[in-house]
């Protein structure tokens, strides 16, 4: 499943982000805490060069907290300060400015020594579509400035946003992978709703989700669908879920499209509890 999804505004965004780097002090790299590697754009390292950076593990409330802790340690071992946040309810957002000041202390001390008038920290927010950039900006700015939505690709224009007197943010359109050569990356992004359902095979996503749950959270899978045991054959598992959820066609046959929708919706709406689809040790 090689998915290619690179609208023109994303290619343009890459060029504009590269140009804007000379205007900013620090980069906030926003990733989905459930899939920190799959929700990182592989071009980001190349684009950002040596800019100071803070990794923001967003949607931390939807992820397995013990795995998020391991990811935090993983990135910090690589020298990237990392915060677990929730841009919807504000969890962890009060740590962003202090962490930025700490990281930029030497730069701002040098500016002060040269007699440069103090100014706000200028930050660039980067991330793939639907990772929560607009929600984060609105929460920090305490007003509805950036368009938000659960559709990938909502933000399409870059804009500066003032956050008090000490921080200015530059939002960018989500820059997604030009293509997903690793099938797992595409499946993980699809399972969390980061890419449009119209460009993927949803049954593949449902199969991935069930196998993932069977391997990592089997008791949650059994509890959700009232299963005594998890059938080995994926078709049999679909049949069981279809029956339990009443996804039937005339004549009592299983409606696999409906069953697929139920499984994906249950994953995305946290009916299995907080899930982490990636662990540092598996990368």
Swiss-Prot record:
It is found in: Cytoplasm. GTP binds at residues 58-61, 86-87, 130-135, 174. Belongs to the TRAFAC class YlqF/YawG GTPase family. MTG1 subfamily. Interacts with ctc. Interacts with the immature 50S ribosome subunit. 2 molecules of rbgA bind to one 50S subunit. Keywords: Cytoplasm, GTP-binding, Hydrolase, Nucleotide-binding, Ribosome biogenesis, RNA-binding. It comes from the Bacteria. Essential protein that is required for a late step of 50S ribosomal subunit assembly. Has GTPase activity that is stimulated by interaction with the immature 50S ribosome subunit. Binds to the 23S rRNA. Required for the association of ribosomal proteins rplP and rpmA with the large subunit. One of its GO terms (biological process) is translation. GO terms for cellular component: cytoplasm. The keyword Calcium does not apply. NCBIfam families: GTPase_YlqF. This is Ribosome biogenesis GTPase A. One of its GO terms (molecular function) is GTPase activity.
